[in-house]
Every structure is written in C-alpha cells, then in structure tokens.
Amino acid sequence: MRTQWPSPAKLNLFLYITGQRADGYHTLQTLFQFLDYGDTISIELRDNGDIRLLTPVEGVEHEDNLIVRAARLLMKTAADSGRLPTGSGANISIDKRLPMGGGLGGGSSNAATVLVALNHLWQCGLSMDELAEMGLTLGADVPVFVRGHAAFAEGVGEILTPVDPPEKWYLVAHPGVSIPTPVIFKDPELPRNTPKRSIETLLKCEFSNDCEVIARKRFREVDAVLSWLLEYAPSRLTGTGACVFAEFDTESEARQVLEQAPEWLNGFVAKGVNLSPLHRAML
C-alpha cells in the first residue's frame, strides 16, 4: 500500500546574523513559519530491508540524496536500539514542487518527512526529540520540520522556541537562479554583528533579512523581483535565497498581484501556517 506525506515549504519571516563561531558557523536569530504548499512524498513499504528512491534527482547520487540519507539514518538508529522490525524497507518517490537552492527548505523538509513518516510506518517508536536530534545531523533546518510548529530559532538554528506569528498570505516568487548557501555566508560584506534581541522585541519590530543585501548585490534577478514586489507589499528574502516573498492579509490580494506579475516572474500564492501540514496529516 502506498501512502502520501506532505513535505511543506518554510519561510524565514526574519533572519538576523548575530555572530560567527570559531568553527566558521554563523549564529543567528530567525523566525520559521510553514506554508500550506510543498512537495509530496509517496512511500510504499518493502519487507526485504531495501531503501529505493524511485525519483532520482539529476546530478545527485542515490546515496547522497537527503531522502535516502534520512531513511538510512532512521534505519540504523532504530536498529542499534532494537526498535527496527525485521525486513523494514521502503520505495520512496517525490512529487517535487519546491526549487532547489530557493531558501524554502525543500531538501530539509523532505528529510524530515521521511524521518517522521518511516518512524510511523515502521512502528519504530522513536520520540520527536530523537528524530529532531537525528535531523540536525542532516541539516540545521531539519529539526523545525520534524517538530512541526512555527518557531523562533537561535544558535546555528538548532535552539527552537515554538511561537505563533500571524498566519498571513504570501506571494512567493522564484527569480530563476539557485543560490548556494555558502555564497552568501562567505561574502565579506555580510552583516555578522546584528545585536541579539528577545523574541518579544523582535515580533514588535519591522522584519528583515540580513542576507538580503548580499543576495540583491550578487544576483540581479533577486534584486529585480524584490524591486517589483516592493511596489505592492512588504517583501523580503527567505533564508539565503533565492526565493523572495510578499505578505498580504488576504488570498485575493495576493492573487491579484500575481495576476499582474510580468512574464519573467515565476511565483505561487500560499498561506502561512503555524502547524506543519505534515503534522496536520497525522492528527
């Protein structure tokens, strides 16, 4: 039997770089919120212990794909603690809607969905804390998708505090370029000393993203899309880009602006949600 599992996008409603550690990682403060839009992962259980990704990504080796890595990590962790039923395996496929290198968390969300779904389907019984800890070894954004609630993140993104920001409507636009995260974080002009503030203070301030100035400077496509969106609504970069988003109070307002978009602007409208569609599907 094949089951389908949501793998939602996320937005960074704000992102501030507060420092850089000796190991090179940047410390930050950011606000994650999910979208009711994303990829869909289909899973069919196998009884011979094999993991097979039926929809490979061009240019990514099978064993390097985050989906496969997540499945194998769960398999090993559960087996090591005697919680993996004999023969547990899976055929996995993905209906990919989220762009790579877009700042929407697609790969991290895929990994989290696989961890949560296979833990349920294989009946391993690992806790959310255990799954989140495993997820952190796959990527800094994986734990928030595992836990499934909008969150204020600190440290390198691993310290999560659940929050409930307003659930607005967003026009999310992809400028047609992919921005590797290191390109932004290695830029010498990236702001790295934004003062730390409490979540209460940050929620009262106008939101912004410290990475935006670098993305706009280095990628004219990002600058062009943001310049157009800013004529209609508050707009900013998500993550390290390349996607940008404009926020609206209603779906109709967002769709009206999308209908006016120039042909070169590729976008979609989605609602911000504080409970992940993955976790809603499991209720």
Swiss-Prot record:
<dbReference type="GO" id="GO:0016114">
    <property type="term" value="P:terpenoid biosynthetic process"/>
</dbReference>
<dbReference type="InterPro" id="IPR036554">
    <property type="entry name" value="GHMP_kinase_C_sf"/>
</dbReference>
<comment type="similarity">
    <text>Belongs to the GHMP kinase family. IspE subfamily.</text>
</comment>
<dbReference type="Pfam" id="PF00288">
    <property type="entry name" value="GHMP_kinases_N"/>
</dbReference>
<keyword id="KW-0414">Isoprene biosynthesis</keyword>
<dbReference type="GO" id="GO:0050515">
    <property type="term" value="F:4-(cytidine 5'-diphospho)-2-C-methyl-D-erythritol kinase activity"/>
</dbReference>
<dbReference type="Pfam" id="PF08544">
    <property type="entry name" value="GHMP_kinases_C"/>
</dbReference>
<protein>
    <recommendedName>
        <fullName>4-diphosphocytidyl-2-C-methyl-D-erythritol kinase</fullName>
        <ecNumber>2.7.1.148</ecNumber>
    </recommendedName>
</protein>
<dbReference type="InterPro" id="IPR020568">
    <property type="entry name" value="Ribosomal_Su5_D2-typ_SF"/>
</dbReference>
<comment type="function">
    <text>Catalyzes the phosphorylation of the position 2 hydroxy group of 4-diphosphocytidyl-2C-methyl-D-erythritol.</text>
</comment>
<dbReference type="InterPro" id="IPR014721">
    <property type="entry name" value="Ribsml_uS5_D2-typ_fold_subgr"/>
</dbReference>
<comment type="pathway">
    <text>Isoprenoid biosynthesis; isopentenyl diphosphate biosynthesis via DXP pathway; isopentenyl diphosphate from 1-deoxy-D-xylulose 5-phosphate: step 3/6.</text>
</comment>
<keyword id="KW-0067">ATP-binding</keyword>
<keyword id="KW-0418">Kinase</keyword>
<dbReference type="InterPro" id="IPR006204">
    <property type="entry name" value="GHMP_kinase_N_dom"/>
</dbReference>
<keyword id="KW-0808">Transferase</keyword>
<dbReference type="GO" id="GO:0019288">
    <property type="term" value="P:isopentenyl diphosphate biosynthetic process, methylerythritol 4-phosphate pathway"/>
</dbReference>
<keyword id="KW-0547">Nucleotide-binding</keyword>
<feature type="active site">
    <location>
        <position position="10"/>
    </location>
</feature>
<feature type="binding site">
    <location>
        <begin position="99"/>
        <end position="109"/>
    </location>
    <ligand>
        <name>ATP</name>
    </ligand>
</feature>
<comment type="subunit">
    <text>Homodimer.</text>
</comment>
<dbReference type="GO" id="GO:0005524">
    <property type="term" value="F:ATP binding"/>
</dbReference>
<dbReference type="InterPro" id="IPR004424">
    <property type="entry name" value="IspE"/>
</dbReference>
<feature type="active site">
    <location>
        <position position="141"/>
    </location>
</feature>
<dbReference type="InterPro" id="IPR013750">
    <property type="entry name" value="GHMP_kinase_C_dom"/>
</dbReference>
